[in-house]
Amino acid sequence: MIQEKKKFDAEVGKILNLMIHSLYSNKEIFMRELISNASDACDKLRYLSQSNSELVAGDSNFKITVKVDKDNGQIIIRDNGIGMNKDDLIENLGTIARSGTANFLKSLSGDSKKDNMLIGQFGVGFYSSFMVADKVTVTSRKAGEDKVHIWESDGLGEYTVSDSDKEFTRGTEIILHIKKEEDTFLDHFRLKHIVKSYSDHIAVPIYFFDEAGNNEIQLNSASALWTRPKSEITEEQYKEFYKSLSYAIDDPWITMHNKNEGAIEFTNLLFIPSSKTFDLFHPDRKRRVKLYIKRVFISDENIDLIPSYLRFLRGVVDSEDLPLNISRESLQHNSVLEKIKNAITKRVLGELRKKKEESPEEYNKFWANFGGALKEGLCEATTNHEKLLEVCIFRSALHNKMISLDEYIANFKEGQSTIYYLSGDNPDKLLSSPQIEGLLSKKIDVLLFTDTVDDFWVNVNSKYKEHAIKSATRSDIDVEQTTSQSEAKNTDSKKSDDEYKLLTDYFKETLGELVKEVKISKKLTSSPACLAVSDAAMDIRMERFLIEQKQIANASAKNLELNPKNKIIEKIFNDLKANNKNNEELVNLIFDQACILEGEPVADTGAFSKRLNDIVQKAIL
């Protein structure tokens, strides 16, 4: 027997070190992980056997067995699934193969208490065995192959892989050599209870050997949970299925179990988590809903079963209308799958709309966790934009709470027809922005957008139910203007611009190319000035984001709006009327201040500092 000794990847070593020294109280999850892996192995072979029946020749009844050998201090888990060859053992057990495990590593903080909490949150598969075992032996034979291989490790940095002449049928056997301090897991009654609690939803029969090791007792019903009538499933069974499926420690917030009958037949058992999922904004944006066809697991990767913006969903979809032998490639552009996706999307958005109306406090928590992902759908080419906007909520500047667009519209001031928003990084900073002081003074609400995605979706969705969605940074906002007064106000605006032409020309002449235009503001009430952009221009925050991402090279010149009622601006204007044009430093300081308030860079920080010092010096002398 040739034996090779290998070192674990550094990443695996980190996980094993945490498992071995774990203080995590719920160590029994190792059985959940190993049973889940065994079930997956059976599901994979069941799928492959649809196109190659020889893979299951002589043994087509899938099963998992669990046995306790108390005398030798061992727990033995056996399945007759796909099995592994030498390369599989090295790849699956010696390296990081699962993105969830990689994400687990990234989340480690170095704080042992917090890191042990993560074990339950992520589920780290096979490696959790080392929480209770000081040695693990894996014997496996891959379906369709003759060779048997043995993998063994004490979890201390190295493992061995060897060929074996052992008589062994297809599948995998895992022997856990239980630590002395964890010998309570060798108690038949306790282990039987653990296996039963984690296995009832597993579609593969799970058998438990009696204490004599002779008779097998089936512990689970071996029927997929989603195939049972809802009336026969308890809330606890739903919760356990969700936790096992999702490697989660939280309970689901919403459970959706539906059987769709008609032109397209499918069953869905879907969950919305109550806590934020760790991989929600992972670059690959993976979706975590498993596709089954007639109870046979097909895939949970690279299939367009749910839209990306609903990737927080967990669960299964089981179709009756797709052929079992369909290739994963064929699933990419499949009309039946597209109809299932549309039906699920409609159902989920409908459920969210109902929750938003019935349980606003709970919905606020959901939105804090998943609102950012949901709004990504507003940037996609989908027919669901209005339905998505119906379930969106935003921070109200006027009422300091989360409200929907429909609530915003219901509270329109007389003559108002536009939905106003302001985007930025921090809601508290936005509340003190000059951009919205005039609107708020007239009790016109402004929605505060603080997610990066907000700057993108507003470029795709300029209206909601015929009402324009408009940034408060736009130049043509007049807080006094109403529908009934618009004609008169337009005349007044022209008169105001003419009256203050001396002022605006002076600012433009002083600032030159730093500004595009200088205008008299119709939205400022106390601040001296603010930056603004025209309706045709890119939003200020969006432009800044694209510069940071190196999508565009330089910032464009903005408009500068002046408040003639402000004492500083009034003083400059009066000086101009008296033919005093010695306020250039003050004009530059006002512009720099407007840039700072808008998060824009100051062109010359040295000059800005000098101007500020000069003004302070004059004030105190």
From Swiss-Prot:
Family matches, as InterPro entries: HATPase_C_sf, Heat_shock_protein_90_CS, HSP90_C, Hsp90_fam, Hsp90_N, Ribosomal_Su5_D2-typ_SF
GO cellular component labels: cytoplasm
UniProt cross-references to Gene3D superfamilies, sorted A to Z: 3.30.230.80, 3.40.50.11260, Heat shock protein 90, C-terminal domain (1.20.120.790), Histidine kinase-like ATPase, C-terminal domain (3.30.565.10)
Pfam families, per database record: HATPase_c_3, HSP90
Molecular function as annotated in GO: ATP binding; ATP hydrolysis activity; ATP-dependent protein folding chaperone; unfolded protein binding
Localization annotation: Cytoplasm
SMART domains: HATPase_c
Broad class of where this protein is predominantly found: cytoplasm
Region (C): 545-621
Region Disordered: start-end pairs: 475-494
Region of interest called A, as start-end residue ranges on this chain: 1-328
Region (B): 329-544
UniProt keyword terms in alphabetical order: ATP-binding, Chaperone, Cytoplasm, Nucleotide-binding, Stress response
Subunit field text: Homodimer.
Recorded family membership: Belongs to the heat shock protein 90 family.
HAMAP family in the record: HSP90
Function: Molecular chaperone. Has ATPase activity.
Name the UniProt record assigns to this protein: Chaperone protein HtpG
